[in-house]
Amino acid sequence: MPSLVGSEMCIRDRCLSVLYLPICAIIKCTSEGSVFFRQKRIGKNKKYFNILKFRTMRIDTPKDCPTHLLKNPEQYITKVGAFLRKTSLDELPQIFNIFKGDMSVIGPRPALWNQDDLISERDEYGINDLKPGLTGWAQINGRDELPIPEKVQMDKVYCDNVSFVFDVKCLFMTVVSVFKHDGVVEGGTGAIADEE
């Protein structure tokens, strides 16, 4: 049994390296700073954890500021970063958050530690009691285009329907959404759409 576990880990590491190494090399060669980006987020029962992503923004980007609150987010996003965000490849390092137990594959996306409006609205429906996910119902039903109240309602739908079958549905729809680049709006939580 231990040898089986070891071989599975070896296969996992090799598969990840095939994806990670080219991305790491491109980020390192095209912009200053670390390849990875860590940020304090809200986990299950509102416990803090550090989420891991590929860095997609310049090192002078204001710290701990949600992208939608930046005056002009495009000026901070690197060219490589724009591609990674559009394809959701920047989220790949969160596989390690899943291995650690901080996150699930499916669940509400983890809020920044200082997103008080999102956190408080989620409190009303018990959403903060769930383990956050790599993808979730809100991600495949609007993502960046959703204002926070609508995003919370989508999270509530997931909270009320948690099941293996619903998770499989979310996973399938995520794959479709990623290929179509649905809902990717830099700086958007519905605000940009409303202004237009």
Across the structure, where does each feature detected by a protein language model lie?
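Hydrophobic structural segments characteristic of membrane proteins
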Residues: F96-E196
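Soluble non-cytosolic domains of exported or imported proteins
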Residues: L16, E74, K86-D90, V162
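Alpha-helical membrane and juxtamembrane elements of multi-pass inner-membrane transport
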Residues: E74-G81, V162, F166
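Short, well-ordered beta-strand elements within core beta-sheets of diverse protein domains
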Residues: V80-T87, K156-D160
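Short, conserved beta-strand/loop elements in beta-sheet-dominated catalytic cores
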Residues: G6, A82-S104
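A hydrophobic, helix-centered structural microdomain
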Residues: S7-E8, R12-D60, N97, F164, ...
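Short, glycine-rich, amphipathic interfacial segments at transmembrane boundaries or analogous
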Residues: F37-Y76, L134-Q153
